[in-house]
A protein has these predicted regions:
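Glycine-rich, small/acidic residue-mixed loop/short-helix segments
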Residues: 183, 188-195, 205, 209-292
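Acidic, low-complexity central loop/insert segments
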Residues: 10-12, 18-19, 68-174
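Anionic-ligand-binding alpha/beta catalytic cores of soluble enzymes and soluble regulatory domains
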Residues: 144-225
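Short glycine-/aliphatic-rich beta-strand segments at the starts of folded cytosolic domains
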Residues: 12-34, 106-120, 216-226
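Acidic, proline/glycine-enriched N-terminal capping motif
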Residues: 1-66, 73-74
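Short amphipathic beta-strand starts and helix->beta connectors
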Residues: 1-7, 56-67, 99-101, 123-131, ...
Length: 292
C-alpha cells in the first residue's frame, strides 16, 4: 500500500548518532568481516563516492546497529556514520572483535554535523561526505561535515516531524528503535537493502544464510495508522482480541488528524487492514496498513 503526503522541499539539520574514523593497514579486512554489506566496491572507489549501507549483527544474527561506511582519503581510512545507532555501541561492538588486527577506531561524532537537502541539493564543498541517504523523500541528499565548515542550506527549514513522517511512510526502520537487538534483519526487510549474500564470511552470516534458505520469518515490521493523537509512550503493545500480537515502535502525526507508525507484529495472527487495540479485549485503535 502506498502512502502519499505533499512532498516538501528545503533542508533539515541533524547530528549523527555516530561518526567514527577507522584507520590502519587492516581496516578494510577487519570491517569486511564485521559488516553485513560488501565493502570492496567502497574501498575501490574514490573518496566522495557513495557509501555502503549495512548492519552490525550479533553472532545470532540479531541487529545491534546500522550504519553507512564511507571510503576516506586513503585505502586504509574509512568512516562509519549512523542516523540513530549510537557511536559507543558501534565502537564497542567493533573493538570487541579486534584481536591481532592493526586497526584504530576514533569517535569523532561531536566534531561533525549533518544536513539533508530535500529536493535539489546545492553544490557540495570539498570535505563534505555527500550521499543518498535513507530518508524516504522522492529526492533528497545527505551531507556530513565538520562543525566548523560551512554548507549552503537551500529553501525552508524542515522540522523533525516532517522528516520522520517521510521515513515511516516509506517503511524505513530506524535502528535500533524499529529493528534492534531482539530482531532479525529479515523481520524489518533490511535483508533487501543492507545484507550481501555473496560477499563471504562476516559476523552473523551463517544465520542470514539459513534465513534466506528458510524464506520466511514469523514477524514483520509494518505500517500502522490510527485516528487522533499518536501513542503517548513507545513501544506500545497491540492486541488482536485478547492476544498480544506485537508493538508499535515509532509513530508520528500524519498531518490530517491521525497518526502513522511502524509496528513489529506477528504474521501468524494478523492480516492486512486488521483492526487492533492497545489493550487486551480493548476498543479498536489502529489498523494495519501492510500485510505482515
Amino acid at each position: 500500500m502506498s502512502i502519499t503526503f505533499s512532498t516538501p522541499s528545503g533542508f533539515f539539520e541533524w547530528s549523527p548518532a555516530a561518526w567514527l574514523r577507522v584507520t590502519g593497514p587492516d581496516a578494510l579486512s577487519f570491517l569486511q568481516g564485521q559488516f553485513s554489506q560488501d565493502l570492496r566496491p567502497v574501498a575501490a572507489a574514490a573518496r566522495g563516492s557513495e557509501p555502503a549501507y549495512g548492519l552490525w549483527l550479533t553472532l545470532k544474527g540479531k541487529v545491534e546497529a546500522d550504519g553507512f561506511v564511507f571510503r576516506g582519503e586513503s585505502a586504509d581510512e574509512f568512516w562509519i556514520g549512523s542516523y540513530f545507532s549510537r557511536a559507543p555501541v558501534i565502537r564497542a561492538r567493533l573493538e570487541g572483535f579486534i584481536i591481532a588486527d592493526d586497526v584504530t577506531i576514533e569517535d569523532q561524532t561531536d566534531a561533525w554535523t549533518g544536513i539533508t537537502w530535500v529536493g535539489e541539493a546545492p553544490p557540495v564543498p570539498a570535505g563534505v561526505f555527500a550521499f543518498t541517504g535513507r530518508r524516504g523523500f522522492p529526492v533528497s541528499r545527505d551531507g556530513v561535515y565538520r562543525r566548523d565548515a560551512r554548507v549552503d542550506a537551500v529553501g525552508s527549514r524542515l522540522d523533525t516531524e516532517t522528516v520522520e513522517r517521510a521515513r515511516i511512510a516509506a517503511r524505513i526502520p530506524a535502528v535500533p528503535v524499529d529493528a534492534g537487538p531482539g530482531d532479525l534483519p529479515n523481520e524489518a526487510d533490511l535483508d533487501a537493502t543492507a545484507v550481501s549474500y555473496t560477499k563471504g564470511c562476516y559476523l552473523g552470516q551463517e544465520v542470514m544464510a539459513r534465513l534466506k534458505a528458510m524464506g520466511q520469518v514469523r514477524r514483520r515490521l509494518v505500517r500502522v495508522g490510527g485516528i487522533g493523537s499518536k501513542p503517548s509512550a513507545l513501544p506500545a503493545a497491540v492486541f488482536a482480541g485478547e492476544r498480544q500480537v506485537g508493538e508499535v515502535r515509532s509513530a508520528v502525526a500524519d498531518g490530517a488528524g491521525g497518526w502513522l507508525g511502524l509496528a513489529m507484529v506477528s504474521n501468524l495472527h494478523t492480516v492486512a487492514n486488521a483492526e487492533l487495540a492497545f489493550s487486551a479485549g480493548g476498543a479498536s485503535a489502529l489498523r494495519l496498513l501492510d500485510a505482515p
